[in-house]
A protein has these predicted regions:
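Catalytic cores of the polymerase beta-like nucleotidyltransferase superfamily
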Residues: 1-299
Length: 299
């Protein structure tokens, strides 16, 4: 692919894809090109004792690896389109458009589910969640963003499978939280997390995980502030305006920052350095090195 296009760049180490740049300036478009991958049975994979956090050295030179819980850590094997479709999570994500024949290839009745506005997992849902627990969050994100109904068999294992997210690196969970809040349906995403019983995944969202229907008089100023910020974020996305992760983090942590800041001022600290110290302390306590300060600072 790279040899066909002048402005093409190979991306990735584990599984390489090609980014082809079309157009120039602000109007340029990046087209992602990847190869179909084979569907591999978990019982045919090499198994490592730990997880992705503890087994990096065990992954060297291997193409198909699962951890002790059954999560797929690596599956870099080329395959035909029909097997690539079987690897997808939802039926609506396994649709292939052939630009030559102008035909949509549908191996798993995705068009039918699309018309019925249904999220259905391909294969056995419990197994698919074990392969990649982050699929739980994709279910929530798609349901909130599209307004689709989660098919009963897809929904049934979700609460039990949530414990598998303990093995996911915090950096990836942080990124998934940001994705939920940047969909343009942040409030709906929070409601869906609550609806599916996934209330303990993101401590930063804990203030919003109260029971639905709480009277306005009992909704704290902190909750109202965060909900207002997320509503504003949803509005910005709807207007095709940018949303900075640093802004969302600031809104989520502002209540704690303000309390610490005011306490420092009451003890005689100067306002500006006290504010910076409060921000640093709350960031370290609530976020730590999850995403890296540089990434957020550049935002």
């Amino acid at each position: 692919v790279k040899s066909l296009f002048r402005r093409a760049f190979i991306i990735g180490r584990r599984f390489r894809i090609v980014h082809v740049v079309h157009g120039r300036g602000r109007d340029h478009e990046v087209i992602e090109v990847s190869t179909f991958r084979a569907y591999l049975e978990a019982d045919q994979a090499d198994q490592v004792a730990g997880n992705e956090k503890t087994s990096k050295s065990d992954l060297v030179g291997k193409t198909h690896v699962v951890d002790a819980s059954g999560r797929v850590l690596r599956d870099n094997v080329w395959g035909p389109q029909i097997e690539d479709a079987a690897r997808r999570d939802f039926t609506i994500n396994a649709l292939y458009y052939d630009p030559v024949t102008q035909v949509v290839v549908d191996y798993h009745h995705g068009l039918k589910d699309l018309k019925k506005q249904t999220l259905r997992m391909i294969g056995d849902p419990a197994t698919r969640y074990r392969e990649d627990p982050v699929r739980l969050l994709r279910v929530v994100r798609f349901a909130a963003k599209l307004g689709f109904t989660i098919e009963p068999a897809t929904k049934k294992p979700m609460a039990e499978a949530a414990r598998l997210l303990d093995n996911i690196p915090q950096s990836r969970l942080f990124d998934e939280m940001i994705k939920l809040l940047q969909t343009g349906h942040a409030l709906a995403s929070v409601a869906e997390l609550r609806k599916q019983g996934l209330t303990q995944l993101f401590p930063l969202l804990a203030p919003l995980m109260a029971e639905p229907g709480t009277p306005p008089s009992k909704r704290t100023q902190q909750i109202q502030f965060i909900e207002s910020a997320l509503a504003d974020t949803d509005k910005r996305v709807a207007e095709d305006r940018s949303v900075a992760p640093s802004y969302m983090l600031a809104c989520l942590m502002w209540h704690d920052v303000r309390e610490r800041w005011q306490a420092a001022i009451e003890k005689g600290a100067h306002a500006v350095p006290a504010l910076q110290e409060a921000i640093d302390a709350v960031f370290d306590a609530r976020v730590g090195d999850i995403s890296g300060r540089g990434k957020l600072a550049a935002d």
